[in-house]
């Protein structure tokens, strides 16, 4: 099949390209951006020289629909909702890696502070949490989940949906590598501000909060909100979500382990660890590693969920959704050993 990538020069766009080039069933037909149009991508990113040398093209939906079978949007929030309209009109498959189609329009406006897509368009998009939402060939439009949301939702979904934890007790402390802040120059991600430092940002205001709540409420209506904090750590890639919660009355700790293993037993990219996971065990992969510890003294269950924010938190999950949409094996192009060192 042939694909097009819009937003090729960002971190996520580049990672999407890297994964697509190693996919057994995919040819990258065109790449698009607002800048460097007409320039070979390998002239901007020399690591691609001799591997992929196509020119960056101006965005043209008609050209994409003529030459490709699917379009990926790896664009900043506020872009895809406008550029995707013609694809939706023509029922042409779209996977949007931005937040533009994840939330209802009123919630999007509140949290993103940008004009939303229409209700009709948003309802046509399926939220692409691959292990949970049963993505298939019936789905034409996918709203790829956010990175923090992916790590948090996959850790909580089995427990929330089976009513094993108190939904009024959830605290999430999530930490991200610097690529999660995007490529745009910003004072908060300046080298001297993040090197040898730990920076908490968007406390109680991160746009993934309503996404997480919306998704988990679908499986347990009792959940009203979560306490969620986000911090930057001085690594390039990765997310560590540390979650604190309490068990429902009568629930035993062995039920937590058995539920995780039962829910995810046929999910190739979820690994339930015997101990707590480490970030370097997932970097460069599409895996989500989940582990937990229960404190008998305080009655607190601590869950740790780790992912590579650029792969499972973005490009890898997008490829996984593409595989499910087009009836490929779910793991095609995604069997990657962790970089580890």
From Swiss-Prot:
It is an enzyme of class 1 (oxidoreductase). Pathway: Amino-acid biosynthesis; L-arginine biosynthesis; N(2)-acetyl-L-ornithine from L-glutamate: step 3/4. InterPro entries: AGPR_AS, AGPR_type-1, NAD(P)-bd_dom_sf, NAGSA_dehydrogenase, Semialdehyde_DH_NAD-bd. Gene3D superfamilies: Dihydrodipicolinate Reductase, domain 2, NAD(P)-binding Rossmann-like Domain. Pfam families: Semialdhyde_dh (PF01118), Semialdhyde_dhC_1 (PF22698). It comes from the Bacteria. Its EC number is 1.2.1.38. It catalyses: N-acetyl-L-glutamate 5-semialdehyde + phosphate + NADP(+) = N-acetyl-L-glutamyl 5-phosphate + NADPH + H(+). Keywords: Amino-acid biosynthesis, Arginine biosynthesis, Cytoplasm, NADP, Oxidoreductase. GO terms for biological process: L-arginine biosynthetic process. SUPFAM superfamilies: Glyceraldehyde-3-phosphate dehydrogenase-like, C-terminal domain, NAD(P)-binding Rossmann-fold domains. The keyword Cytoplasm applies. It is found in: Cytoplasm. CDD domains: AGPR_1_C, AGPR_1_N. GO terms for cellular component: cytoplasm. Its main location: cytoplasm. SMART domains: Semialdhyde_dh (SM00859). PROSITE patterns: ARGC. The active site is at residue 147. One of its GO terms (molecular function) is NAD binding. Catalyzes the NADPH-dependent reduction of N-acetyl-5-glutamyl phosphate to yield N-acetyl-L-glutamate 5-semialdehyde. HAMAP family: ArgC_type1 (MF_00150). Belongs to the NAGSA dehydrogenase family. Type 1 subfamily. This is N-acetyl-gamma-glutamyl-phosphate reductase. It comes from Staphylococcus epidermidis (strain ATCC 12228 / FDA PCI 1200).
């Amino acid at each position: 099949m042939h694909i097009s990538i819009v937003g090729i020069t960002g971190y996520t766009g580049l990672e999407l390209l890297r994964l697509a080039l190693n996919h057994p069933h995919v040819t990258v037909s065109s790449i698009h951006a607002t800048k460097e149009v007409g320039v070979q991508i390998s002239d901007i990113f020399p690591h691609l020289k001799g591997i992929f040398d196509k020119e960056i093209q101006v965005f043209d939906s008609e050209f994409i629909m003529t030459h490709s079978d699917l379009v990926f949007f790896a664009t900043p929030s506020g872009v895809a909702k406008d550029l995707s309209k013609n694809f939706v009109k023509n029922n042409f498959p779209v996977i949007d890696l931005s937040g533009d189609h994840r939330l209802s329009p009123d919630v999007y406006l509140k949290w993103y502070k940008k004009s939303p897509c229409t209700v009709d368009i948003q309802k046509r998009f399926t939220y692409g949490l691959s292990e949970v939402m049963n993505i298939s060939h019936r789905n034409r439009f996918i709203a790829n989940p956010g990175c923090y949301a992916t790590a948090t939702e996959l850790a909580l979904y089995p427990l929330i949906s089976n009513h094993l934890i108190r939904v009024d007790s959830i605290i999430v402390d999530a930490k991200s590598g610097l690529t999660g802040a995007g490529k745009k120059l910003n004072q908060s991600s300046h080298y001297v501000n993040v090197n040898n430092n730990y920076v908490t940002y968007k406390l109680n205001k991160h746009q993934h909060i309503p996404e997480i709540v919306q998704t988990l409420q679908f499986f347990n209506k009792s959940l009203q909100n979560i306490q969620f904090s986000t911090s930057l750590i001085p690594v390039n890639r990765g997310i560590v979500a540390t979650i604190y919660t309490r068990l429902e009355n009568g629930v035993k700790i062995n039920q937590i382990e058995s539920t995780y293993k039962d829910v995810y037993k046929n999910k190739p990219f979820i690994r339930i660890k015997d101990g707590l996971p480490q970030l370097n065990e997932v970097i460069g992969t599409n895996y989500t590693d989940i582990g937990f510890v229960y404190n008998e003294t305080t009655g607190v269950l601590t869950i740790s969920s780790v992912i590579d924010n650029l792969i499972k938190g973005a490009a890898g999950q997008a490829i996984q959704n593409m595989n499910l949409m087009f009836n490929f094996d779910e793991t095609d192009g995604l069997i990657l050993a962790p970089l580890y060192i």
